[in-house]
């Protein structure tokens, strides 16, 4: 049973279409090579795929350029030569005209060139300017609101810092006052120590360390009731031997002692 005839139409499946292109291209180039070799013909083939990739074949006896020149000579056709200088001149002229139009539009927007405008043109220009001004004002208000928000945030930050510093200062002041109160409470304790002259006189009177220790304790216990300025009062002794003013130790540096 022979092969069925394939319908010649575009293959919808891209994979099948690519596979068929590769097979048919290989077969075509093979047939072109056989024709050139067997018949000594000048054959040239140029193929572009659907993706734009180029494939070419030329018979071994010549090059593809030679075949194209031979084709042009045989058909009396020539490719149009491109004049690059003229193209550049045309492009420069076009750009110059465009720049003149832009400059004219700018002068009209600034109000410098309105003499050539009609009433309708002036009305259109006025509407365009009003629309532009409204957009500029909207952008201005947006920027002002952003700046105000930034200033409010900075103000809040400064207030928080100020509150924190104020609290720290108050805490330091309270701590300093507490320290002063504690020092004030400890100050009277220093007054409990007897004056050096007083303690020395008591020790000398009782004639020894053993007897002076008790007397010194009694004097120290009585010290809070005495003021430093009241040490000049005269104390009278209660012992008979101390009541005699002629006694050898009748007083302590001119003062009597009453126990």
UniProtKB/Swiss-Prot annotation:
InterPro entries per record: MADS-box/MEF2_TF, MEF2-like_N, TF_Kbox, TF_MADSbox, TF_MADSbox_sf
GO CC, any one term: nucleus
Domain called K-box: residue spans: 85-175
MF annotations from Gene Ontology: DNA-binding transcription factor activity, RNA polymerase II-specific; protein dimerization activity; RNA polymerase II cis-regulatory region sequence-specific DNA binding
Nucleus keyword on record: yes
GO biological process: positive regulation of transcription by RNA polymerase II; regulation of transcription by RNA polymerase II
Domain MADS-box: 1-61
Gene3D superfamilies: Transcription factor, MADS-box
Region of interest (Disordered), residue spans: 237-259
Cellular compartments annotated: Nucleus
Superkingdom, taxonomy of origin: Eukaryota
This protein's UniProt keywords: DNA-binding, Nucleus, Transcription, Transcription regulation
UniProt entry tagged with the keyword Nucleus: yes
Pfam families assigned to the protein according to its UniProt record, in alphabetical order: K-box, SRF-TF
Tissue: Strong expression in female inflorescences (ears), but also weak expression in male inflorescences (tassels). At early stages of the development of the female spiklet, expressed in all organ primordia but later restricted to the ovule and the developing silk. At very late stages of development, expression becomes restricted to parts of the silk.
Function: Probable transcription factor.
Protein name: MADS-box protein ZMM17
Gene transcribed to yield this protein: M17
């Amino acid at each position: 049973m022979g092969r069925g005839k394939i319908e010649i139409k575009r293959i919808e499946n891209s994979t099948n279409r690519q596979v068929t292109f590769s097979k048919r291209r290989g077969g075509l180039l093979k047939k072109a090579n056989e024709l050139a070799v067997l018949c000594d013909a000048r054959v040239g083939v140029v193929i572009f795929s659907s993706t734009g990739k180029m494939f070419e074949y030329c018979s071994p006896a010549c090059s593809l350029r030679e075949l194209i020149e031979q084709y042009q000579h045989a058909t009396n056709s020539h490719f149009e030569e491109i004049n690059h200088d003229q193209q550049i001149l045309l492009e420069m002229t076009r750009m110059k005209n465009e720049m003149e139009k832009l400059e004219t539009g700018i002068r009209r927007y600034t109000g410098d060139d309105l003499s050539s405008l009609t009433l309708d043109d002036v009305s259109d220009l006025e509407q365009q300017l009003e629309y532009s001004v409204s957009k500029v004002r909207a952008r201005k208000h947006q920027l002002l609101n952003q700046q105000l928000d930034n200033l409010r945030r900075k103000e809040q930050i400064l207030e928080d810092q100020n509150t924190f510093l104020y609290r720290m200062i108050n805490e330091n002041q309270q701590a300093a006052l507490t320290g002063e109160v504690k020092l004030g409470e400890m100050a009277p304790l220093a007054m409990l120590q007897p004056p050096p002259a007083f303690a020395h006189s008591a020790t000398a009177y009782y004639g020894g360390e053993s007897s002076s220790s008790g007397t010194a304790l009694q004097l120290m216990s009585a010290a809070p009731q005495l003021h430093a300025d009241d040490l000049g009062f005269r104390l009278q002794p209660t012992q008979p031997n101390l009541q005699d003013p002629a006694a050898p130790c009748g007083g302590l540096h001119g003062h009597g002692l009453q126990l």
